[in-house]
């Protein structure tokens, strides 16, 4: 399986105030898009996204475990020391999934909050693993084995996604090994010619 990352540019910032006066910062917008070729040359069939978002909502969002990071790590696991937000909802709307995430009071969440307060326009980027199948037209169709690591990481440069999010990490694959997700490196075996040759 390959690591797959996608960026979305348009997110809104919301500030909600509780009755006690405590303010919470949220980001909201399109987190995932289906049935359309994206700038990375990939297309997520809606049925694949629908199935995976349903699983992700049940296992992560509803249990308060749907976390995202500030920036994009190189692997499919969420690093707790880099967590900046918690995804609180992810709902289908046409060929999109609209998400909402609460910015947390973690060190990375505080950085994200400061960036927003200082007027920085941030984007979101999904991260997951799955297989890709290329069509004759050169579109990479994401397979039905796709699994979200997070529906949204917060990223700094959504205006240049092709430079920042190449999407597939060359030379690495992720495999299940006894219930643990492990990195598998591509390996080439070279042999020297035998003396008889």
Residue locations for each model-derived region?
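Residue microenvironments linked to proteolytic maturation
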Residues: 3-7, 12-29, 65-69, 79, ...
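Intrinsically disordered/low-complexity terminal segments and short unstructured peptides
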Residues: 16-17, 47, 190
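N-terminal "first-domain core" detector
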Residues: 31-56
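Short, surface-exposed beta-strand/loop "edge" segments at domain boundaries and coil↔beta transitions
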Residues: 33-40, 74-78, 107-110
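Short, well-structured hydrophobic secondary-structure segments
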Residues: 59-64
């Amino acid at each position: 399986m390959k690591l797959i990352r996608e960026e979305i540019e348009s997110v809104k910032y919301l500030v909600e105030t509780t009755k006690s006066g405590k303010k919470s910062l949220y980001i909201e917008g399109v987190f995932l898009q289906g049935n359309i070729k994206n700038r990375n040359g990939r297309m997520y069939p809606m049925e694949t996204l629908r199935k995976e978002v349903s699983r992700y909502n049940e296992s992560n969002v509803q249990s308060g475990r749907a976390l995202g990071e500030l920036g994009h790590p190189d692997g499919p696991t969420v690093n707790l020391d880099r967590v900046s937000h918690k995804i609180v909802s992810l709902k289908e709307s046409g060929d999109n999934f609209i998400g909402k995430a609460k910015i947390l009071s973690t060190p990375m969440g505080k950085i994200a909050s400061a960036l927003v307060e200082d007027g920085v326009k941030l984007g979101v980027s999904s991260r997951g693993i799955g297989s890709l199948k290329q069509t004759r037209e050169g579109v990479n169709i994401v397979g039905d084995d796709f699994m979200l690591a997070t529906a949204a990481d917060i990223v700094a440069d959504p205006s240049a996604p092709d430079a920042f999010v190449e999407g597939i990490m060359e030379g690495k694959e992720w495999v299940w090994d006894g219930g643990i997700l492990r990195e598998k490196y591509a390996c080439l075996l070279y042999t020297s010619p035998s003396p008889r040759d």
